[in-house]
Amino acid sequence: MSNGAFDAIFEYAWGQIDKPISGDFIYGKDLPKLIEIIENIFQKAQKSGSYELRLPLFSEINKDLFRTFSNTKTFFKIHKEEFDDIFFNLVNHPLREILENAFIGVDSIPSDFIVSMNLNSPSKFLVENKNKNTEGAGISTPRKKLTESPIKLLSRKNIGKALEVQVEELKRELTAKQSLLQENERQVSELKIRLETYQEKYASIQQRFSDLQKARQVEDNQNSSRTSDPGSPLVTGIDQKAILEEFRRRLQRQTDTISFLKDQIRRERGLNCSNDKVSHSKRKHATTDGDGTFKNFISAVPSNIWVKATIRIIVCFALLAGVLPYIRKYVYAHDTPSQNSRLQLSWWENSGILSKIVWFFEDQTDLETEYRSNANVDDAYSRVFGI
């Protein structure tokens, strides 16, 4: 098949859509119409019965692709030089191959096909192109055929829109970051102001600490100079806990000493009382049986010392007045003890009643003296240890 047959069919269909005012291009919305014109030519040839053809030329899937392209790229300009690439990217086959495969038994479009379909007359575009070519080779230059497909152009346009969206998003993000940066700068300024304030406070506190340290050193020097004076106060730096602990330790030691002394005094009192009881028992052997009545009488007297003493004096005078005649008689009646006797008794010791009275008063005097001595000792220790 010569290229003239295919070009004649294509130019005929193109001329049905393209107008002189268009500028040698059709819009994307006209692509289905162009395909329909070409398909009508072949359907008309089949009806005439001159040729056996494989119809339809385009499947429904391909027609759907043409319609989709026309809807999405309505005002997309399709130039004649760009048509082959656009068509191939849509159906993955060139238009020339589809038209050649439509004839059964031949591999190309028959030359008489154009004559039979009255396609020999050139279209207006062929005439215009021929006129332009006759004017001169340098006047008219063919358009440079684009190698980019409409899908690439569509993807480029989509990419352009996506880039525009990204640019807008980046602008908004940049604005937000600028606002955030301004806020951070404001916070940094506030932090700098606060830092300066804290530095000033720190310098002031450090100065006060230095002044206090100097004053403390001066005070310590003054206190150390006054330590030689007995009446000078103690250094304020002494640990109060150590002082209290030392006081407690001394107080405990004094308390233990006092307890020990009191126990010793009690033991001494017990020993004296036992000695008095022993001496008193010895003296009982020199008395008569009539002393039991006197002992019972004395024990009935109240425990108060002074009352007992008064009563005892009265009783003694009464007894002396009653027994004095008997004493005289007893003294003169008995002989003087022999010199060989180991025990030399006084005249009053020979009488049981007189010896009892004398020994009673001596015992009371000894007990009172010992009691006063022990009481004085207790008072002395209490005053010494502050009890």
UniProtKB/Swiss-Prot annotation:
Keywords: Coiled coil, Cytoplasm, Cytoskeleton, Membrane, Nucleus, Transmembrane, Transmembrane helix. Residues 220-230 have a biased composition (Polar residues). The chain crosses the membrane at residues 311-327. GO terms for biological process: protein localization to spindle pole body; spindle pole body duplication. It is found in: Nucleus membrane; Cytoplasm, Cytoskeleton, Microtubule organizing center, Spindle pole body. GO terms for cellular component: cytoplasm; nuclear membrane; spindle pole body. Its main location: nucleus. Residues 157-269 form a coiled coil. It comes from the Eukaryota. Residues 216-235 are annotated as: Disordered. It is a single-pass membrane protein. The keyword Repeat does not apply. Interacts with BBP1, MPS3, and SPC24. Component of the spindle pole body (SPB) required for insertion of the nascent SPB into the nuclear envelope and for the proper execution of spindle pole body (SPB) duplication. Belongs to the MPS2 family. This is Monopolar spindle protein 2. It comes from Saccharomyces cerevisiae (strain FostersB) (Baker's yeast).
